[in-house]
Amino acid sequence: MALTQFENDLEILRDMYPELEMKSVKVEEEGEFPQRINGKLLFKISLLADVNIEFGEQHMLLSNLSNECVEFTIYSCHYPDIRRCVVMDIKSLWISTDEKKMLIDKALRLVEETVDMSIEFADSFTSILILIFGFLIDDTAILLFPNGIRKCLTQDQYDLFKQISEEATLQKVSRSNYHCCICMEMEKGVRMIKLPCENANVEHYLCRGCAKSYFTAMIQENRISSVRCPQCEYKELKLEDFKSYKKMLKALFTPLIPVSFLKEVIDTELCERYEKMFYNQAATRLSKYCPYACVTCRRCDSWCTKEDLDDAMIQCQKCHFVFCFDCLHAWHGYNNKCGKKVSLSTDIIEEYLDDTVTSYERKRKLEAKYGRRVLELEVNDYLAEKMLDLAIKKEGSNLQRCPKCKVVVERSEGCNKMKCEVCGTLFCFICGVLLYPEDPYEHFREAYSGCYGRLFEGMPGTET
């Protein structure tokens, strides 16, 4: 075979595969077929349909793959022994060593089964390469993705496929035309910015100029809720719909436009301003809905948010000050009790307590808002107070509440003029009314008083 015919064959191959490179061609004499041909081809495995990439509970759809590379050396002197004639190596970031060996073996077996080994090598040279390249491009997906699924063995493998998918998407976007939803101009994807819309099934784009001016204006005007895709429908977050406090936190403190995205579009100073305003706005809203969730740090005045509603210990993420949510002093440990910062209303406690009226879902929402442990403690206190009230109202009871601090006082002896040992308040044991400190007995002397003449009523030793 003349060398010019070999060169013609190479031109045919290059026309079919523009990425084909021939590294070296060695000949002994002019006009002879090359004894050794070195080359490589960048190729992309063709996916007939989207494939599922899985790792544990993570999964994603993959539509395109990155370029792989096959390096080959052909020795004409070893023909027709195709195993010695063709030496191949596949370069890939994600195809395993065993899979590479399997693909090469199947490619060579296809050549052995298809090419007529009785003809001259010069006549079969082009056919061999076309078969190998065609197999790698068109027939390997079914082997590497059986049933359209690829199960990753490590997180790194899964992340690699995620990166491949993102790069393939970027390449596709850069070649396509898109409308900016603000100025309505059409531009190539390379000049556009794809917005990170909450709905993954939609694709909205802004040209770089509009993206910068829009987000800059929204932040400068303190319109934090407008820092989002201007084309997507906006739905305000309803905190009362959440049944989990942690899910509420995640939803409330996750911006619709990630700060990492904004850093690629606007100035760093504006990004920092937005991040601070967004967090403060979210924390303020949470503190109004969940009284046990947020408080400002007494050291640096930054908002601090609880990770666990039932935990009184809280740490400032800015200055790292650890303090008690209830008393706002430096953390004193769980065993040293302090006063409650917030008390629940009786209506909330009774609603949580009543299983006949309150549904399971409503209870979960109350727990997401106030904390399960907080509710249980409040319920226990409420029931204890109810029991005390019943004991006080019982006929012949020697118990009464202080009208000021509500502490239960027991009369073991003496008259009906009582003094609270906690707050020092003077009151009538019979009716609970406050007594004048200057003349506490006036209440029992006045004829219009319901306790007139009853100062010693019920006093041990005075029964008649």
Swiss-Prot record:
Q: Does the keyword Zinc-finger apply?
A: yes
Q: Which GO terms describe its cellular component?
A: cytoplasm; ubiquitin ligase complex
Q: Write out the GO MF terms.
A: ubiquitin conjugating enzyme binding; ubiquitin protein ligase activity; zinc ion binding
Catalytic activity from the UniProt record: [E2 ubiquitin-conjugating enzyme]-S-ubiquitinyl-L-cysteine + [acceptor protein]-L-lysine = [E2 ubiquitin-conjugating enzyme]-L-cysteine + [acceptor protein]-N(6)-ubiquitinyl-L-lysine
Please name the SMART domains in this protein's record.
IBR, RING
Q: Under what name is this protein listed?
A: E3 ubiquitin-protein ligase ITT1
Q: Where are the zinc fingers (RING-type)?
A: 180-236, 402-431
IBR-type zinc-finger residues:
267-338
| Residues that bind Zn(2+) 2 | 290, 300, 316, 319
Ligand binding (Zn(2+) 3): 402, 405, 420, 423
Signal peptide extent: none
The UniProt entry annotates the active site at 415
Pfam families in the cross-refs: IBR (PF01485)
Q: Where does Zn(2+) 4 bind?
A: 428, 431, 443, 451
**Role, per record:** E3 ubiquitin-protein ligase involved in translation quality control. Involved in the rescue of stalled ribosomes by promoting ubiquitination and degradation of proteins on stalled ribosomes. Specifically required to resolve RNA-protein cross-links caused by reactive aldehydes, which trigger translation stress by stalling ribosomes: acts by catalying 'Lys-6'-linked ubiquitination of RNA-protein cross-links, leading to their degradation. Interacts with the translation termination factors eRF1 (SUP45) and eRF3 (SUP35); overexpression decreases the efficiency of translation termination.
Give the E.C. number(s): 2.3.2.31
- PROSITE patterns according to UniProt: TRIAD (PS51873), ZF_RING_2 (PS50089)
What the entry says about domains is: Members of the RBR family are atypical E3 ligases. They interact with the E2 conjugating enzyme UBE2L3 and function like HECT-type E3 enzymes: they bind E2s via the first RING domain, but require an obligate trans-thiolation step during the ubiquitin transfer, requiring a conserved cysteine residue in the second RING domain.
Q: In which pathway does it act?
A: Protein modification; protein ubiquitination
